[in-house]
């Protein structure tokens, strides 16, 4: 998987519409729900334990290659094609605390819990993956650190270009 760090991103490579989404704060769940007039679904693809990458471990200030529970899912708005591919990385240490609720949410979006009555601390970086522009957020929520990665797929870029909604 090829990554391009945000300091290497050329402004002309990024549409103004998508740039707003990549750098928006708050709940992507709520923003997508609003864009899709209330239609929003989560389709879990895979959930498993795996070792964190060196870069993710370092970003979260965790021991190198720490074990994490990883949840991958597709997020759908008002179209049949998925808009976002999401990947959440919860270190085992966070699962021993309040973040353990995220392991059992099934088809519910993480954002519904993450932003409920709280605004977690967030460090963000924007990268380009093969599948599309991606924002990675390292959250600190009730003393738990975890990463939420959201890749905006081509179908989403096409939708926002044709429907010029703003967030």
UniProtKB/Swiss-Prot annotation:
Gene Ontology cellular-component annotations: cytosol
Q: What class of enzyme is it?
A: lyase
Give the UniProt keywords, A-Z.
Cytoplasm, Lyase, Pyruvate, Ubiquinone biosynthesis
Q: What pathway, per the record?
A: Cofactor biosynthesis; ubiquinone biosynthesis
Annotated EC: 4.1.3.40
Q: Which GO terms describe its molecular function?
A: chorismate lyase activity
Q: Output the Gene3D superfamilies linked to this UniProt entry.
A: Chorismate lyase-like
List locations, semicolon-separated: Cytoplasm
- Read off the InterPro entries from this record: Chorismate--pyruvate_lyase, Chorismate_lyase_/UTRA_dom_sf
Q: Does the keyword Lipid biosynthesis apply?
A: no
**SUPFAM superfamilies for this protein:** Chorismate lyase-like
* UniProt-listed GO biological process terms: pyruvate biosynthetic process; ubiquinone biosynthetic process
**For substrate, which residues are the binding ones?**
71, 110, 150
Q: Which reaction does it catalyse?
A: chorismate = 4-hydroxybenzoate + pyruvate
Q: Which domain of life is it from?
A: Bacteria
Q: What does this protein do?
A: Removes the pyruvyl group from chorismate, with concomitant aromatization of the ring, to provide 4-hydroxybenzoate (4HB) for the ubiquinone pathway.
- Indicate the family of this protein: Belongs to the UbiC family.
> What is this protein's record name?
Probable chorismate pyruvate-lyase
The organism is Acinetobacter baylyi (strain ATCC 33305 / BD413 / ADP1)
Q: Which gene encodes it?
A: ubiC
């Amino acid at each position: 998987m090829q990554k391009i760090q945000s300091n290497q991103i050329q402004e002309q490579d990024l549409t103004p519409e998508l740039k707003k989404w990549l750098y928006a704060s708050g709940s992507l769940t709520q923003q997508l729900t609003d864009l899709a007039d209330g239609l929003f679904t989560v389709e879990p693809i895979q959930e498993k334990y795996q070792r964190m990458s060196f870069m993710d471990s370092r970003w979260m200030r965790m021991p190198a290659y720490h074990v994490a529970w990883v949840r991958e899912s597709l997020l759908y708005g008002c179209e049949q094609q998925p808009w976002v591919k999401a990947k959440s990385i919860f270190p085992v240490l966070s699962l021993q605390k309040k973040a353990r609720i995220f392991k059992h949410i099934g088809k519910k979006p993480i954002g519904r819990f993450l932003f409920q009555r709280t605004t977690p601390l967030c460090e963000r970086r924007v990268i380009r993956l093969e599948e599309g522009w991606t924002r990675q957020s390292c959250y600190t929520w009730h003393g738990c650190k975890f990463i939420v990665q959201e890749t905006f797929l081509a179908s989403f870029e096409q939708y926002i270009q044709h429907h010029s909604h703003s967030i």
